[in-house]
């Protein structure tokens, strides 16, 4: 995949998700991205009802609340790309900064979440598999460390695999709707361990949810995100 094609693909994806391009400065409001596959695509690991509620209600609330907070912020913040907003939170008025941080993070995290699912699981291949072996001890070690990290989160949060421009991978966790994007990081993929992501099917069995989630990852899409990150073109 050429760098030019990767940039075009990620730019188109960002526009579809309502982010705008990183350099754009004119957008009226953020919008809820359409789910890129049917609601039942991730059955049986993630049930259809959970997908509907998670996308149509929970994610939609983050988008709506983000737009309200940015409108209250003034100063042209509502027209700026999400990546720019999250990387420059110190410039947001203190009265709405926490709301922008939480809801902007929720919008970014969930948009990434939908993007990396809808697949058939399996194993990564090629350059991505090599990077996982180099930086994270191999696929099985990654799965174990990732799942254990998810179990250790007290309350709500996310488990991420982050990637830098050199292609180096790292495991990270964040509480609530925090995101590495606020620190200049980039997310390759991540899992939502808020109860709304799994409780209808798994109740308190978070471990079962974490294990099942790997079966719906789209490794082709994640590999494309990896290539884009190395090209400096992964927006969210």
Model-derived features: positions:
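Short helix-capping/linker segments at secondary-structure and domain boundaries
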Residues: 21, 115-124, 201-206
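All-alpha RGS (Regulator of G-protein Signaling) helical domain and cognate RGS-like helical scaffolds
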Residues: 45, 57, 68-165, 170-171
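Structured secondary-structure scaffolds
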Residues: 52-63
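An amphipathic alpha-helical core segment
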Residues: 148-205, 211-220
């Amino acid at each position: 995949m050429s760098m030019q094609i990767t940039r075009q693909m990620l730019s188109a994806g960002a526009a579809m998700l309502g982010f705008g391009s990183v350099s754009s400065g004119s957008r009226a409001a953020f919008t809820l991205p359409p789910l890129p596959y049917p609601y039942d695509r991730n059955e049986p690991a993630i049930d259809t009802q959970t997908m509907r509620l998670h996308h149509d209600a929970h994610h939609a609330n983050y988008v709506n609340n983000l737009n309200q907070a940015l409108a209250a912020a003034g100063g042209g913040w509502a027209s700026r790309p999400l990546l720019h907003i999250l990387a420059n939170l110190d410039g947001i008025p203190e009265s709405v900064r926490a709301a922008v941080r939480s809801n902007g993070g929720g919008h970014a995290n969930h948009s990434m979440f939908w993007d990396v699912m809808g697949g058939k699981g399996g194993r990564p291949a090629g350059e991505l598999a090599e990077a996982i072996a180099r930086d994270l001890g191999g696929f099985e070690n990654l799965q174990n460390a990732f799942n254990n990290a998810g179990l250790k989160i007290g309350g709500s949060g996310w488990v991420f695999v982050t990637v830098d421009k050199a292609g180096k991978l790292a495991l990270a966790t964040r509480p609530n709707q925090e995101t590495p994007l606020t620190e200049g990081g980039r997310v390759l993929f991540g899992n939502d361990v808020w109860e709304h992501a799994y409780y209808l099917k798994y109740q308190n069995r978070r471990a079962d949810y974490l294990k099942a989630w790997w079966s719906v990852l789209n490794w082709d899409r994640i590999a494309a995100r990896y290539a884009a990150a190395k090209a400096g073109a992964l927006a969210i």
